[in-house]
Swiss-Prot record:
Pfam families reported for this sequence: 7tm_1
Function: Receptor for thyrotropin-releasing hormone (TRH). Upon ligand binding, this G-protein-coupled receptor triggers activation of the phosphatidylinositol (IP3)-calcium-protein kinase C (PKC) pathway.
Transmembrane segments annotated in the record for this chain: 29-51, 62-83, 100-121, 145-168, 194-215, 267-288, 297-319
Protein's recorded name: Thyrotropin-releasing hormone receptor
Disulfide bonds: 98-179
Species the sequence originates in: Mus musculus (Mouse)
Cell membrane found in the keyword field: yes
Upper lineage: Eukaryota, Metazoa, Chordata, Craniata, Vertebrata
Membrane-topology annotation of the record: Multi-pass membrane protein
Amino acid sequence: MENDTVSEMNQTELQPQAAVALEYQVVTILLVVIICGLGIVGNIMVVLVVMRTKHMRTPTNCYLVSLAVADLMVLVAAGLPNITDSIYGSWVYGYVGCLCITYLQYLGINASSCSITAFTIERYIAICHPIKAQFLCTFSRAKKIIIFVWAFTSIYCMLWFFLLDLNISTYKNAVVVSCGYKISRNYYSPIYLMDFGVFYVVPMILATVLYGFIARILFLNPIPSDPKENSKMWKNDSIHQNKNLNLNATNRCFNSTVSSRKQVTKMLAVVVILFALLWMPYRTLVVVNSFLSSPFQENWFLLFCRICIYLNSAINPVIYNLMSQKFRAAFRKLCNCKQKPTEKAANYSVALNYSVIKESDRFSTELEDITVTDTYVSTTKVSFDDTCLASEN
């Protein structure tokens, strides 16, 4: 979501210092290389998996690709330059690099924030308004929204081209070059505060409210409430399965439903909580420094704040993608990992409006893959292996 802080932090690091402790340099380089390296690989895999696998091109995955690209920008533009900063103690990318790298930092963070907001709204519509979702949550609409998100953030972040410049400080034994600002802190502080509100506070409030509605649906609506829908699903089940249902299997299915829905809700809570916590130190620092005459610039705390941001960008593939069976299978296929032969994949998946729809339908989302045992069990359906499955062969 944001890097208003990242740019300021890079400037903070480059403030005149007699020397940077060797242990600080080593820790910085080690952490940045590991976290950013793994994050870059993970986000690239997300993009490749969705682009190369036809059945993965869903509206939800479209937002995940946008988020992965934004996280790549954050990791590359905001993370990797810290290595050269730690080694040389000075800005080595020149004036053009100062403009472009800072621009990409802000673009990646703000686009990440907007992508998460768009994804949150899409999840809310898909789960809480499944009828509307069939024409609102489409692949073509998702692409248009993403184009708008990137166009908006690209234009918005251009203001930094007019605020940045190289600052040169001369000392006895060295000349330190920093990527800084042309204007006083009193002028750019309002910009940071605006970014804090637009790209952090508002998305977090919106996510909290919408995920609250999602949790209410998942917890308080364990079975379909429409008798006609129940009757229709029962008739469809009777064609393909035994008419005599076992009560024990029904209980197992119900327990599986409750457990699955709790798991989904936990995942949604983790998404919100991690995003809020990992961005909070950096955002809080920016807000506090905006009101201080002399900004707080302790190196180790600044490093902690940056590492939190890099972790947020690196961990997103784990949170959003590795909880999906389809993504795991696509990852293994991409890595050419050998898999045991399995039964043919089901041709149908269960939507959260308790109706069965084809996977090729435009309203196909990844959350349904996560909750494959979550919605259809209310009809006491028994699969061929005596477990609760939400698909038909």
